[in-house]
Amino acid sequence: DSSVLTSEYPR
């Protein structure tokens, strides 16, 4: 899964 995306979207 894309953990990088989840780290940038819900800021």
Swiss-Prot record:
Tissue: Nacreous layer of shell.
Superkingdom of the source species: Eukaryota
Name of this chain's protein: Uncharacterized protein SMPP18
Species in which this protein is naturally found: Nautilus macromphalus
